[in-house]
Amino acid sequence: MSSLSDQLAQVAASNASVAFDRKKRQKLHSASLIYNPKTAATQDYETIFENALGALQELCDIEPRFQVFSKTLFSETSITIDRNVQSKEENKNLDNAINAYLLMVSSKWHLAPALHATEWLVRRFQIHVHNTEILLLSTLNYYQSPIFKRILNIVKLPALFQPLSNFVKNDSNPTNITIIKMFNDTDFLKLYSNYLSKCIKHKSTYTNQLLFVTCCFINLIAFNSSNDEKLEFLVPIILEIAAKLLASGSTDCQIAAHTILIVFTAALPLKKDIVVAAIETILANLKDKKAEQSAFWAVIKISQTLKGQQAIEHLPANIYKIFDKHYTWVRVLDLLTEEPSIKCDKFMTSYIRAMIRFDHSKLDMVVPLVQKLSLEKYEFRSIVIDLIHLSEVLEDKSKLIDLFEFLVKENESLVINCLSSLNLTGEMFEIRLTTSLFSKTNDDNELELLKTLNSHKNTSSDKKEETKPFKQFLEENSEFIVTSNKSMISEDDEKFNKILGLFIEAIGTGYQAGLFLSSFMTTLEARLTFLLRVIVSPSAPIALRLLAMNNISKYIQSIDKELNLFTLIPFLLVAQSGSSKNLKISVKKILGQIGNRPFTKHYFMSNQLYGEGKDIKVPSPSDSEMWTKNFIENYVVENVDISGVFIPKQAEKVFLLFWAQQVLDIPLPYPQYMILNFLGKYVPNTASYSGLFEESISSYLERREELLLRCALNKTDPIQFETAMVNLISNKEKHHFMLDFIINVLQSDYEDLIQILVDRLVEVFATFKTSNQLRIVQEILQSVTKEDQIYDALGTLQSLQIDPDTFVCIFKENSINSESDVTSFPKRRRRRSSTNKAALQSAEVSQIAEDHLKKLTIMLETLDKQKVKGSEELLSSLFFTLADFETLDQDGGLPVLYAEELLASAMLNTIRSLKDQGLTQLQNVRADIIVSAIRTSSSPQVQNKLLLVIGELATLSSEIVLHSVMPIFTFMGAHSVRQDDEFTTQVVEKTILTVVPAFLAANSENITEEIEFLVMSFATALQHIPKHRRLRLFTTLVQALGSDNSLGPLLLLISQQYSNAVKSFKISESRSLVEFTKLLLSKFEVQEQITGFRKFLELYEKLLLANKNPEKKVTLETQALFSSKILNLTQSEFCDLTNNSYDFLTKVIVDTNDDYYDSSRNFKIRLYSIILDPTVSNATRKALDESYSSVLKMILSLIADYPDIFVFETNENSEKQNSVHFIGDILEEIKQSLYGLLHAILDVLPINVFLTTTVPLLESSIDKEIRYHIASNIFDKFENETVDDHELTQSVVHTLNEKIPQEENNVAQVLLNLQSSLINKYGSFFDNNLLVEVLNLASGLISTGPRELQISSIAVITNCVSVMGVKFISFYPKVVPICIKLFNETRASKEELAPQLQLSILLLFTALVKSIPSFLTSDLISLMKLIFFSSGVEVTTRLSVIQLVTEKLDLKNVLGTLLKVWNSEVKESGDSTAISLFLSLLEGTVEKIEKKSATSQSPLFFKLLICLFEFRSQSEFDTNTISRIESSVYAVANTYVLKLNDKVFRPLFVILIKWAFDGEGVSSESITEKERLTAFFKFFNRLQENLKGIITSYFTYLIEPVNELLKRFISGDISDVNLRRLLLNSLTSSLKYDRDEYWQSTSRFELICPSLVNQLSNIEPTIGKYLVKAIGSLAAKNSSVDEHNQMMNKLLVEHMKATCSSNEKLWAVRTVKLIYSKVGESWLVLLPQMVPIIAELLEDDNEEVESEVRGGLVRVMENVLGEPFDRYLD
């Protein structure tokens, strides 16, 4: 039985869509996949259904299977279906239909119709409530799409989907890691696996879903990759899913299964039986060819996970058959070729082993398979051993020959080891296979086997049947019996091979060799020639050859002694070439036999040996004897190389020709190859004998197939054979037939032969004549144009050592333009002709042009790689080729960029090679071709390389500089410098550094104009050059051109760009131009920079004069630097340009914060370092002084001549729009810019040089405005810099003393300011007399001078006071009274300079306070007035002076003066600022005054305090302002009181009480009693807050006056809410801070209690709470005294009677409530007296009173009583 919670959950689920109220129904109805809730809530079912029906029809058009739902879920009756009233069975059917629909629609969620159709199921059947799981599962693979986020928003997530809840809250799509975590949940994984199984079963899987499933499983495996336990748990789940996917028949499903299995087995290697089962399942279910590749690699990769020997066991027969059914061996090879990087050795080893075991018909497939694989050693060994075992049982062993030849070639040692492990030797195995296999021989094994063979024992240990008789063997093979004396050397290869096979078989069977030979060859000649052929046959095993040697030795003895056996020598020589020592010994033995015979003229078989009628050209008997004996004597068995004894020196030529002829005569390829090798080793240069091979070589290609077939039949390597033939090509080859052979081979389709030829050509090509080289190269180039090239023509050419002349010939022969088109130097580059263009449009001609381009490109690649020695002819041909490329590009539209880049590289290499050879001059270089190519090329790389060519040519040909530099630099400025790459930058720099020096040297007469043109070319492109590359480029340019001539023009051009940027409000661009210019100038010496400034000013002066004078403008128009645009500017535009340019130069010179941290770009620091460096020579200093002076003079001249220079000729047409005022403003700006430039130029000088330069400029002969600015510059200089030479500053002050009286007011003011600054900074070092002189001058000026001079003079006096101190006292009467007078004059004045004058006077008094405070006592009132009423001075400044006053002056005097100033000035002023400053000074004084002084001055202070209290009645300020003032006064008073003791303060407090209550000591008749009492109680309350219980006893002086005042409030004699509140608060505070039972005194209590409680009778509602608090505090303090409690209770009851007013009763109730809440326990005894009153109040007519009693008082009493109050009422 299920638990109660489960039952409740089921009920809740079934009723999830049941809504019992309107809101819930609306919420259910508003859940939508498409619409927002508000819109969805307004829709009816009919509208939703109609929309869904249309969507379903669209789905049916896509997938007809949806039609079934039109009769169920989307039928007309579905509108009326309500699952809440249906039966359980009906709902089950409905859910099944919905689930089926969701399975089908899951692949269509990306389509709008699916969304609109499903909307009906959500709205009508609430599938988001009842079918949540299937809805989420079917859409989970869309988790990153908006639709899934929408579904999450409307469903209630089941428990297994809870990880998605966070994304519902955040309204975002789930992340990948969340999905992984969900799948990592075991329950969810099983749930989704079941769902996937349903999808597979119903064939509703689709690509997107399978991709999602695959990714999820892969991520799940990766997530648990380090958790083996989890992976083990996943095994059955994943295998089950994979099996179902594989069994589905869907290609996508199978590919998904393959992928999952690959990843899973890689993470967790499975047992072999599982792997085998998985492979069988994969292959068994493979039906669609689309899945074949995936299945193949799945099988491969799953097998790779197996470990150990079991991994390579042969495949089971059933799996092999299935695999073989799906994959032919050709298909397997193709798949392995497609993915060569994938390891597949384990499965393929198993597959090969299965093939060896089960399918012998496919043994031919083993070799190509093994070639494709990278097998481990143990895998290779397994295959070899299987094949060795197979050789025992396989009848047709010829199938294994090629296979074992390959295996031996791959790893001979391993094969031999495998044989040894099976107790077999290589020699025995060769006999078994009837072929020769091994190059490594074992001499002992050979001899042992030979003995065995000679002893006629059976060598075949594997024979199980009895050997058949030889006679039977002979009869079976009687057709191969030879009865003639014909030579077997010339016998047909197939017949010989058959006889050889029979011979091996016979020997292997155990028949006697002699028996076989005599039986199958009846003549001696046949037997001997057969054996000779055996010993030179590569297919014959070593043991057989040894046996043949023995028999040859025997047969020789049977030959007539008169026959010369020298004809056998070639075969013996070839036979000894192997590695077998025994074979060599046998050869030497036979040679000995031959040498012991007579050397007659009758040679054995001389006309039969190589064929009937073929005479053998043999040496004379004497030569043959000499050769034989020489060879035997010098032949060493251990020697591998016999070339040293191959041809004797005595008859070298004879035997050289003899052996060469043998190659031609012997009809066997292997001996031919071996003899050629012997010849090649002896004579590397084959020219001496290669002529003999003319016929053979000439016909070689025709006979090649026949020769290669013979090689195959004789088991001769065709590559080695052809290599030997090709090696006949000699160094310096001259034979035409050989050259024809080379050409014919290159034209052939024989790739292997061509490669052999190429390898030989690489060795000998360099020795060929140029004509022969040219012929070969032309042929190779011709093959380039073929679509299907047999060999790598480019690689071939690049590997050949081609000489420069050959390249020249090639380029000339492949030229399009005739030399007459391009060699006529005075002509410019020909233009593109329409004729060429039309011709190249032809398809045939176009193809020829493409082939031509391809050839040239190949040659250029070759030339670029080989780096051949350069020559002028080669360079010239490259120029012609460049012209051809331009024709192909411009006229033919062919892609020549790559070829041009190669050509440029080749030209560079050639030029550099010529330079290395010492060449210094080139003639007739066509620079215009390069320039044209640069201009027309669209490739920056080509352009850059051609620019490098220009640079390299610059030093070898002045012609290029003279005729081409301008277009080159124009191009660089327009294009190259704009490229943002390092290579282009380096190219441009290198071009500049190489071309410019040559250019300057060639144009010494007109150098300035040319320099300006080049600078303009680059400066014009400045804004287009990447910012990080500008500096290096322009630095290189200026250095190359020379800074003296180029820096000024460059500054001029940059200043124009700066002006344009400023006018266009491009602030960042203008700032970057200034920064760039600074950085550029920092790369040059200071002298160079100053020269550049001078040139800049000179150029602008020319512009100014040209704008003024039309004749000079015409002159400038010829200069490249002054474009017509600048010269034709309107007057206002030119003024703007001039102003901005001067401003630009100023900013360049002036240092900024960035310059502070980088001294290299700080012009000022670098100038200092030269001027102040003692190591700098005088000549350098002098040159610098002259340059700097010239710049300064030019600026001063411009300023002085300003009115004349800046009067322009007005062009009426262009100046109509410019008003006179506008031009005047611009001219004024120019003037100020010039002054700014002057200031910048002067400011960078060291102070001593600066003064030496500027002081003379103050002479009166100079314009006063200039003097003014010079004086300002001097002032700024001293302000910003420190001077160590104090004599210098004194002299300056002295000079100023003399100059000031003579100057105009504005200049004199600046000089006075300068004097003030100097005295402030260096006055302490000045002589006292000098300061007296200054004071005399200044004191005179303050009384007689104008205001500005008065201000500056006072500043001078102020600084003198600071320096002189008390010594100033003699000037005190002269200065201070006048300053006070000046202040009084300006106090009410509205002069413009009044604030500055007030400030200067205030600062003077500040200095006096600091320096001579004691002398200021008499003028203290004036000082305070100055502080309080200097309205033009900032308040903060005056506050600082106040602080200084409180620190420096005697505070007793200050306090007395404050009282006087208050009464005399401040209180009557009505100036809030003055009052605020007065209070600040008072506060500061009180805070800093000592207690002793405070005690002595306390009467004075309290007198001032009373005056301040009375200010309320005298002021016209608003109440808030007065309150703030009084608050400050109370704070000050409290601070002062804290400095007094009780003995001093009590009398003063009594005075205050009498003033407040009795009016004693009142100084203002206008103040009222209420105001006095208000002021007092505010002060007293603040005092109580600060002093707390210390002054509780002081209430003794107040208790009676307060009692009287309370009574007056009761009687109504006085009425003031604020005063009453203050009074009540004072009582509360006193009660609060009472720590000495002061208020428990009966006398005080009985005095104050009635008056206080009776306040209830007429208390104002606004302050009732203060009264309640006061009474409550009094009750709390006296709660321990019963009599006091009774008294207060009685008084309170009187105010709670029915006859009392409602307000009175209300506050009385609240008071009682507060008392009971505080001290209820003490008042419980009084409760019976209170009950009747409370009962009455509970029935009170006033609701507020009743509510307060019922809700407040009664509840408080109940809390105290601990029981309901109703009990007392009952």
UniProtKB/Swiss-Prot annotation:
SMART domains: BP28CT
Record's bilayer topology term: Multi-pass membrane protein
Presence of keyword rRNA processing: yes
Pfam families (alphabetical): BP28CT (PF08146), HEAT_HEATR1 (PF23243), U3snoRNP10 (PF12397)
Each HEAT repeat, start to end: 1730-1768
InterPro entries: ARM-like (IPR011989), ARM-type_fold (IPR016024), BP28_C_dom (IPR012954), HEAT_type_2 (IPR021133), HEAT_Utp10/HEAT1 (IPR056473), U3snoRNP10_N (IPR022125), UTP10 (IPR040191)
Subunit structure: Component of the ribosomal small subunit (SSU) processome.
Gene Ontology molecular function terms on file: U3 snoRNA binding
Keywords per UniProt: Membrane, Nucleus, Repeat, Ribonucleoprotein, Ribosome biogenesis, rRNA processing, Transmembrane, Transmembrane helix
Domain of life: Eukaryota
Any one GO cellular component localisation term in the record: membrane
SUPFAM superfamilies linked: ARM repeat
PANTHER family: BAP28 (PTHR13457), HEAT REPEAT-CONTAINING PROTEIN 1 (PTHR13457:SF1)
Spans traversing the lipid bilayer: 499-519, 528-548
Predominant localisation class: nucleus
Subcellular location: Nucleus, Nucleolus; Membrane
Entry similarity comment: Belongs to the HEATR1/UTP10 family.
Coiled-coil segments on the chain, per record: none
GO biological process: endonucleolytic cleavage in 5'-ETS of tricistronic rRNA transcript (SSU-rRNA, 5.8S rRNA, LSU-rRNA); endonucleolytic cleavage in ITS1 to separate SSU-rRNA from 5.8S rRNA and LSU-rRNA from tricistronic rRNA transcript (SSU-rRNA, 5.8S rRNA, LSU-rRNA); endonucleolytic cleavage to generate mature 5'-end of SSU-rRNA from (SSU-rRNA, 5.8S rRNA, LSU-rRNA); positive regulation of transcription by RNA polymerase I
Task performed by this protein: Involved in nucleolar processing of pre-18S ribosomal RNA. Involved in ribosome biosynthesis.
Official protein name in the record: U3 small nucleolar RNA-associated protein 10
